């Protein structure tokens, strides 16, 4: 058994958080934040019996995606505090 001291001390492995949000619908999609124009996403469906094997897909800036298994909708969005109108670099 491999001991992951960081995990036991309460820190997440590699400090990677897995975003969790309400089930995305066409009217209210799950917004996936990213600094990049394209991001790889995995959909696991809903909770419990509504879950499914992970479906991987690319989510492009300005486009939405509907999971072909559970019909959950996803939308690409900027990280908090970084709007699309902020196209300047320091």
Curated annotation (Swiss-Prot):
One Gene Ontology cellular component annotation held by this UniProt entry: mitochondrial envelope
Binding site for Zn(2+): 43, 67, 70
GO molecular function ontology, one term from the record: metal ion binding
Keyword terms of this UniProt record: Metal-binding, Zinc
Disulphides: none
GO biological process: mitochondrial electron transport, cytochrome c to oxygen
UniProt family annotation: Belongs to the cytochrome c oxidase subunit 5B (TC 3.D.4.11) family.
Designated name of the protein: Putative cytochrome c oxidase subunit 5b-like
Organism: Arabidopsis thaliana (Mouse-ear cress)
């Amino acid at each position: 058994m491999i001991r992951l001291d960081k995990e036991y001390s309460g820190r997440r492995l590699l400090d990677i958080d897995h975003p969790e949000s309400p089930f995305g619908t066409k009217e209210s999609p799950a917004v996936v934040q990213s600094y990049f124009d394209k991001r790889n996403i995995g959909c696991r469906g809903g909770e419990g019996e509504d879950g499914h094997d992970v479906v991987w897909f690319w989510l492009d800036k300005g486009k939405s995606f509907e999971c072909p298994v559970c019909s959950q909708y996803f939308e690409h969005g900027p990280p908090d505090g970084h709007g699309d109108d902020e196209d300047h670099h320091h």
